[in-house]
Amino acid sequence: MSFIKHSRAKYVILSDCDVVTNIDYKPIVAAHIESGADITAVAHTGVYSSDDIKTSTVFNVDADKKVTSVLINPAISGTCTTSLNVFVMSMDFLIETVNDAMARGNVSFERNILQEKCRELKIKIYEYDNYFSKLNSPESYFKSNICLLYTSPSPRD
């Protein structure tokens, strides 16, 4: 926590290591700042099989892309908005959230922050439409990295 508290950064990006993509964070941070959100979650809306979703976090969102509920590892399929496990927030919000979680014995960002507090926090979605792949096996790791070599990212302004 000492490193975080002494950082001069105003915003922080939290990212898991189970997604392969080539992502430019600048427009995501800019969208986060513009929206005034507590947390901005990078997500993709698409049609998914139950196998694709069973290890994912799924967001229900309103017309303004505000998260209204969070499902963790749901047994669903079809069109849904799934998390890429990339989140933007202010450094101050992160420190406050971590301190509160530690005081309460909370250990899960998805369950204790996103799911439990989605109605009291302003959690917004940044819709990501470029190539990504979730990793859940050695085979998916290999296939995803090969695909990334041959998939050119869409240009962004």
Regions found by a protein language model. Give the residues of each.
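Unchanged
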Residues: 1-146
